[in-house]
Curated annotation (Swiss-Prot):
UniProt-recorded name of the protein: Phosphoenolpyruvate carboxykinase (ATP)
Major enzyme class: lyase
Reaction(s) this enzyme catalyzes, per UniProt: oxaloacetate + ATP = phosphoenolpyruvate + ADP + CO2
UniProt similarity note: Belongs to the phosphoenolpyruvate carboxykinase (ATP) family.
Pathway: Carbohydrate biosynthesis; gluconeogenesis
PANTHER family: PHOSPHOENOLPYRUVATE CARBOXYKINASE (ATP) (PTHR30031:SF0), PHOSPHOENOLPYRUVATE CARBOXYKINASE ATP (PTHR30031)
GO BP annotation list: gluconeogenesis
GO cellular component: cytosol
Keyword Cytoplasm among record annotations: no
Pfam families in UniProt: PEPCK_ATP (PF01293)
Swiss-Prot/TrEMBL keywords: ATP-binding, Decarboxylase, Gluconeogenesis, Lyase, Nucleotide-binding
Keyword Ribosomal protein: no
Organism in which the protein naturally occurs: Neurospora crassa (strain ATCC 24698 / 74-OR23-1A / CBS 708.71 / DSM 1257 / FGSC 987)
């Protein structure tokens, strides 16, 4: 069964442009009748009749509206560049939040308004990213820079054309498509203009939240640097050369376009732009793109937090005494630090007002909840329910965070660089001070540990390594980013730290406990106050890390894993050497590009 009504945007948003009915009223027989009648009463009647028909007419009006007769600059551009059929498809450009709510509720299965006012949407079969289906077009302008391999698999220009044509063909079958224009990057010198062309209102609202929203006057003549064609509801042809499934997420740096087929997971658009910035930043502007959160103290001191999922990146950067620059994606340039995004994309599984009040309160009108379970009567969301996925999310404008710094940038260079890890073996110190080579080694390693599921019978934690804490999104070789980071740290005299939010006293398997959040926050406070830089340090063997002998607010016995260990000396030696070996094994694939001092900065087993 098709749509109950044809929905498109009204082409008569400009009051100066007369709609056909108004044109008939102002000329022709009807107009003569009105003009020849001098009765004020009759004039009022005709005026009231017009108002009744045209005031407050929304997209849900039974008569619907049709594509523009006189095409806009934006429509002409889409028609010329992508052959969007603007005579058949209504192009809804930069719609309001309210109209996107209406469209999502009427046309998209699984959408609803929750009790907090947020829109909830269902992303379909795919509830997370599809990294194995990511492709980069292999073409002359970028092929010598790209880090080819499992992360960036090549796609031929011919296959790109097939997939792009398939996406555009699908978009041309829709009654309406949405266009969202915005910026990636808060620094005007380095930002890129992004256009999203999609078929789902949920996707449009998501990217409206995640991109930086331009003033209305800047949208009138907006010309994108990069365009995303999201036809995620339509599959790729899995028999096309190089396709591994019916899902395809492809980026063409020469054409400055991205095409999505076979996945409706909105995060693919966000992370696609992130990959673009990982390429454009270093290659075009010599700026460093980072998978990090960032905040700023009252004196303007900036801290960057790197970390994989579950290490505390979002939690620790949310500090009542510091302003949030951003929670996920940043660039470090010669002009300071800036956020790439205009919004936040927070995990919501297990969310509560007590644990994360800022995120909880940001879930309101204008926000998009993704794949959550809610009570159909009360519309209250059960954030503990992972029936659809563990990866439940919410996208909201960064303005919804009370202590966000708007604009989201700082002219100051970072004073502290914090590499977060969650070591479930309990053998990494809660805090270590890193030198330049160690910073590069641990940045490239990107270590954390994930707890094994009980169903597979494995009791010990699983080591996870993600280069630069961002491996799925990298465009260039990790060493290129690591060298840039080391240079910037050296040039701006930044302090680098390895902060373990994982287990202390013993590992997870030996009955240890996770480091209390109050101690982790005390460590951060000592870093920000400068106290931790001035205490006495000792060398921690195997990993050769500099560990403080004391830290305000933290028991001294917890600072060195060897002295804190409660599960027997033999088990400690076994665990620390085992983890050291995993680090060395993982780093082998980067040794050909690494300098001798960086290789030697790893563990000595």
């Amino acid at each position: 069964m098709g749509d109950p009504v044809i929905r498109t945007a009204s082409p008569y948003t400009n009051p100066i442009i007369k709609c056909p009915r108004l044109q008939r009223l102002s000329s022709g027989p009807s107009s003569s009748f009105i003009n020849n009648n001098n009765s004020n009463n009759n004039n009022n009647k005709s005026s009231n009749m017009f108002n009744h028909d045209h005031v407050n007419k929304t997209n849900l009006h039974p008569g619907g509206v049709k594509p523009h007769v006189e095409h806009t600059e934006l429509e002409e551009e889409l028609h010329q560049k992508a052959h969007i059929d603007y005579d058949r498809v209504a192009i809804i450009a930069n719609p309001s939040v309210a109209s996107l709510y209406e469209d999502a509720l009427v046309y998209e299965t699984g959408t609803a308004i929750t009790s907090s006012g947020a829109l909830t949407a269902y992303s379909g079969k795919k509830t997370g990213r599809s990294p194995s289906d990511k492709r980069i077009v292999k073409e002359p302008s970028s092929e010598n820079d790209i880090w080819w391999g499992p992360v960036n698999k090549p796609m031929s220009p011919e296959v790109w054309k097939i997939n792009r044509e398939r996406a555009v063909d699908y978009l041309n079958t829709r009654n309406r498509i949405y266009v969202v224009d915005g910026y990636a990057g808060w620094d005007e010198k380095y930002r890129i203009r992004v256009r999203v062309v999609c078929a789902r209102a949920y996707h449009a609202l998501f990217m409206r939240n995640m991109l930086i929203r331009p003033p209305r006057e800047e949208l009138e003549h907006f010309h994108p640097d990069y365009t995303i064609y999201n036809a995620g509801s339509f599959p790729a042809n899995r028999y096309t050369e190089g396709m591994s499934s019916s899902t395809s997420v492809a980026i063409n740096f020469a054409e400055k376009e991205m095409v999505i087929l076979g996945t409706e997971y909105a995060g693919e658009m966000k992370k696609g732009i992130f990959t673009v910035m990982f390429y454009e930043g270093p290659v075009k502007h010599n700026i460093l793109t980072l998978h990090s959160s960032a905040n700023e103290g009252k004196d303007g001191d900036v801290t960057l937090f790197f970390g994989l999922s579950g290490t505390g990146k979002t939690t620790l950067s949310a500090d009542p005494n510091r302003r949030l620059i951003g929670d996920d994606e940043h660039c470090w340039s010669d002009r300071g630090v800036f956020n790439i995004e205009g919004g936040c994309y927070a995990k919501t599984i297990g969310l509560s007002a007590e644990k994360e009040p800022d995120i909880f309160n940001a879930i309101r009108y204008g926000s998009v909840l993704e794949n959550v379970v809610f009570n159909p009567e009360t519309r209250e969301v059960d954030y503990g329910d992972a029936t659809l996925t563990e990866n439940t999310r919410c996208a909201y404008p960064i303005e919804y965070i009370p202590n966000a710094k708007i604009p989201c940038l700082s002219p100051n260079h970072p004073k502290n660089i914090i590499l977060l890890t969650c070591d479930a073996r309990g053998v990494l110190p809660p805090i270590s001070k890193l030198d330049s080579a160690q910073t590069m080694f641990h940045f490239i390693s990107g270590y954390t540990s994930k707890m094994a599921g009980t169903e597979d019978g494995i009791l010990e934690p699983q080591a996870t390594f993600s280069s630069c804490f961002a491996q799925p999104f990298l465009a260039l070789h990790p060493m290129r980013y690591a060298k840039m980071l080391a240079e910037k740290i050296e040039n701006h005299n930044a302090n680098a730290w390895l902060l373990n939010t994982g287990w202390v006293g013993a590992g997870f398997a030996q009955g240890g406990k996770r480091c209390p959040l109050k101690y982790t926050r005390a460590i951060l406070d000592a870093i920000h106050s400068g106290e931790l830089a001035n205490v006495e340090y000792e060398n921690y063997e195997v990993f050769n890390l500099q560990v403080p002998k004391s830290c305000p607010g933290v028991p001294s016995e917890l600072l060195n894993p060897k002295t804190a260990w409660t599960a027997g000396a033999n088990s400690f030696d076994t665990e620390v050497k085992k983890l050291g070996g995993l680090f060395l094994e993982n780093f082998k694939k980067y040794e050909s590009e690494a300098t001798e001092d960086v290789i030697k900065a790893g563990p000595v087993v």
